[in-house]
Amino acid sequence: MAEGLVLKGTMRAHTDMVTAIATPIDNSDTIVSASRDKSIIVWKLTKDDKSYGVRQRRLTGHSHFVEDVVLSSDGQFALSGSWDGELRLWDLAAGVSTRRFVGHTKDVLSVAFSLDNRQIVSASRDRTIKLWNTLGECKYTISEGGEGHRDWVSCVRFSPNTLQPTIVSASCDKTVKVWNLSNCKLRSTLAGHTGYVSTVAVSPDGSLCASGGKDGVVLLWDLAEGKKLYSLEANSVIHALCFTPNRYWLCAATEQGIKIWDLESKTVVEDLKVDLKAEAEKSDGSGTAATKRKVIYCTSLNWSADGSTLFSGYTDGVIRVWGIGRY
């Protein structure tokens, strides 16, 4: 009996591409998603056959695409970044935005919370990385002039390594940069990609970093040493990456499917593709010609904290939920 991923169900409420999915660290039944429909949806997971989750709340306030969303470690707040140039902090219980973070001069592409939730980092098309406190005050800006990126900053993440507080950023300038959080100084520039880098992920123990983008290659880096370890061929543009919390796996959302590698053997263990015809038949009993023609792909990914469930957001606004199963 092999272990693999099977489609458990779908979640439908967004009307445009799902740009980000945030899952709680306590494995509770609430997840949050962001979309180009300018909204954030708070979902209650029901795990039903027809619908894996139901919409609890739609959070609105951003005036343009919402590009990223993350959850605070207590699961009470969500933080979002939008093409309207702002970040917003949301009180999920009240369903309201409690704070706006204004300072970027162009689209915000990525946001992240530090492990203790006391610091916030954001990345933008204005080529800067900003560090904020939770009051919405910008404490530091890493800009293009000095050691900063020379093009759009597409993704930014905190490392979970508390001994060496670190920020990792990816950019359209084809580099990944590693920053000391204590003084916002550059620790290393990771060069190796031949096209823009759209996503970066840090392993659960903070030792590894994976990056991907236009060139269709995932590069794995040793964060402490600042050196390249190896590469994995996705052979398709990469939109999102995430490590599995309890297995030595890395997942990539590509334009040709979701690829999952076992990092020990460096082999592909899964290549998940959507069967739109079967999906249509399951939901309404009819597979239309239009359904078969539509090309969709995954743009966002996140695992449940226990590593049993993979949530994937697609260009058609649907969240597809994959579960570990035996077959």
From Swiss-Prot:
Pfam families: WD40 (PF00400). WD repeats lie at residues 13-44, 61-91, 103-133, 148-180, 192-222, 233-262, 293-323. It comes from Brassica napus. InterPro entries: G-protein_beta_WD-40_rep (IPR020472), RACK1-like (IPR045223), WD40/YVTN_repeat-like_dom_sf (IPR015943), WD40_repeat_CS (IPR019775), WD40_repeat_dom_sf (IPR036322), WD40_rpt (IPR001680). The keyword Ribonucleoprotein applies. Disulfide bonds: none annotated. This is Small ribosomal subunit protein RACK1. Keywords: Repeat, Ribonucleoprotein, Ribosomal protein, WD repeat.
